[in-house]
């Protein structure tokens, strides 16, 4: 079984942050792609960003990659920044930051490949 990290303190910090898109009141939104979660298992609480309720629903409806593409967001970069701002010292935050940085790079490569696939061929 994967080592899922739970942190009520970090989630409370995320819930106090404004939505990363609208700046309005946000709620904790877990990032499932490229994470340590699984089917019906939320990923670690450090794989989390703040989204307005309506946008959080939209993220689930569209699917994560489509949602993040629509808004030109790399969620792992944002999650990494939130971890550095959080006062949660339950775990080695440097390890979490390193993992999120690696996921951000991987997501960037995936995003570039998707963008390349959607461009029309040159004539």
State each model region's role:
Residues 25-39:
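Short recognition patches in nucleic-acid-associated and regulatory proteins
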């Amino acid at each position: 079984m994967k080592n899922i990290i739970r942190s009520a303190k970090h989630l409370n910090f995320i819930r106090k942050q404004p939505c990363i898109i609208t700046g309005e009141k946000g709620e904790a939104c877990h990032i499932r792609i490229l994470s340590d979660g699984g089917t019906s298992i939320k990923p670690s609480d450090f794989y989390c960003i703040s989204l307005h309720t309506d946008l959080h629903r939209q993220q689930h409806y569209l699917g994560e990659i489509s949602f993040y593409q629509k808004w030109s967001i790399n969620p792992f970069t944002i999650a990494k920044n939130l971890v550095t701002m959080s006062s949660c010292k339950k775990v080695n935050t440097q390890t979490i930051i390193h993992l999120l940085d690696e996921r951000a790079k991987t997501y960037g490569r995936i995003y570039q490949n998707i963008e390349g696939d959607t461009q029309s061929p040159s004539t």
